[in-house]
Each structure stands twice: as C-alpha cells, then as structure tokens.
Amino acid sequence: MKKIDLNADIAEGFPFDESLLQLLSSANVACGLHAGGAKEMQSAVKFAKENKVRIGAHPSFPDRENFGRTAMALSSQELIAHLRYQLGALKAICDGEGAVISYVKPHGALYNQAAKDEKIARLIAQTVYQFDPNLKLMGLAGSLMLRIAEEEKLQTISEVFADRHYMPDGSLVPRSQPNAMVESDKEAIQQVLQMVTKGQVNAIDGSLVPVKAESICLHGDNQHSLQFAKRIVEELEKNHIKITA
C-alpha cells in the first residue's frame, strides 16, 4: 500500500485549525513572526497532540505586515537569531504540552528563497541541526534546500503542492504570475494522484517533471480549502493510499 503525508499550515489565526487537524498527518505550526502568536501556537500544539498529528515548526521572516511572503535581505546573524527565536518558542510550548517538534518547514518567502539560494539554505540547515540534529527539514521536492540539508546531515521530507502549478525546472510558478494556482478541484486532485502514484507532474509548458512526493501541502485558510482538503483525503483513501507521517 502506498503512503503519503498530508501537511498544512496552522496557528496562523484562521478558524479552521481544529477541523483541519482531523484530516492531517503533519501540522506546520506558525511561530509568531508572520502570523499567530503564543495563544494560537499553544492551541495548535494541544490539538495536534490530541489528534496524533506530527508537529513541525513553521518559521518565517519577521514580516507580519505581508504574511511572510515578501523576500527580506537579512544578515546571516539576523536570520539565525530569528530562526532560533521561533524554534525556541515552539519548543517551549511543546515541552509544556508534552509534545515534540519533529521537523521544520520554512514559510513563504523564506521557503522560496531557500529553495534557490545556497547561502540561505545552508544557514537554515545549520541552524536547525545545531538546535536539534534529529529534526527533519521539509522543503520543495528536488530543491537546492533539500540537497544542502542532506549535505549538512539533516534528514529531509520532499514536499509537493496540490494547488500550485509547476515550472519546467520543478520550481513553483510564482504567486505573482496569473497561472500560479490550480483553480479547479478536479485538476488539483488529478495532480495529487499523478505525483503520488507516478512520481511526476505536468509543468505549465506541458512537459513532465519528475517529483519525489513524500508530503502533500494543503491549505486550510478558508471554507473552500477545508472542503477541498476533505476531498483530497477521500480520493487518496479511494485509491488505497494511506495517509501517515
């Protein structure tokens, strides 16, 4: 039986976390610098533990104004400090709830920059390894960030996206472009099944791009995305694909 992990971002202040956590096998907990805060983090950890969902830290650039989606030119020391601050905050909450952090997935612009920028990717990997060498790093399948993480002796999780279109090089179509998102639920489900069962995805130019699908990113920031997440779960189960971290 094939297996796949389902992850989504939580503790970002949206009202669907509890419902979403009943569908997921992994939860990316926002650490307060792009959205959410201590209260949201603690609730998310509590719900994740109750639902036996694997917990990941979801650190970002310090950018609440733009939801962490704007690239920032931080010095190495600034980036390291912000990463340590966020990881430490989530660890303290997990310790208090008797839970553990299992992996780290950068958020938004930090995720996208690390997928292509060796310096940022290495700083993230080294900071995570120093914080806890047993943590895994989740990132875009086939990206530079995952290759650097493996060089830095971290285990990795290759992530694919249900609702994003892909470039021929395997990167995501930037959100600034009009065709960045997969708008049709039917198309997104077909894309998920193709990635999980065949290890490939159709790029926007029609070419087939190989992808290693270990975790599927879903979104749960509105009512439609929550319903879509339920449909993805149903389709995976219908195709005898087990959802597990």
UniProtKB/Swiss-Prot annotation:
Catalytic activity: 5-oxo-L-proline + ATP + 2 H2O = L-glutamate + ADP + phosphate + H(+)
Enzyme class: hydrolase
SUPFAM superfamilies associated with the record: Glycoside hydrolase/deacetylase (SSF88713)
A GO MF label: ATP binding
Enzyme Commission number(s) of this protein: 3.5.2.9
Parts of the chain that traverse the membrane: none
Annotated function: Catalyzes the cleavage of 5-oxoproline to form L-glutamate coupled to the hydrolysis of ATP to ADP and inorganic phosphate.
HAMAP family associated with the record: PxpA
Family assignment from sequence similarity: Belongs to the LamB/PxpA family.
NCBIfam families given in the database record: PRK05406.1-3, PRK05406.1-4, PRK05406.1-5
Subunit structure: Forms a complex composed of PxpA, PxpB and PxpC.
Annotated protein name in UniProt: 5-oxoprolinase subunit A
Species annotation: Haemophilus influenzae (strain ATCC 51907 / DSM 11121 / KW20 / Rd)
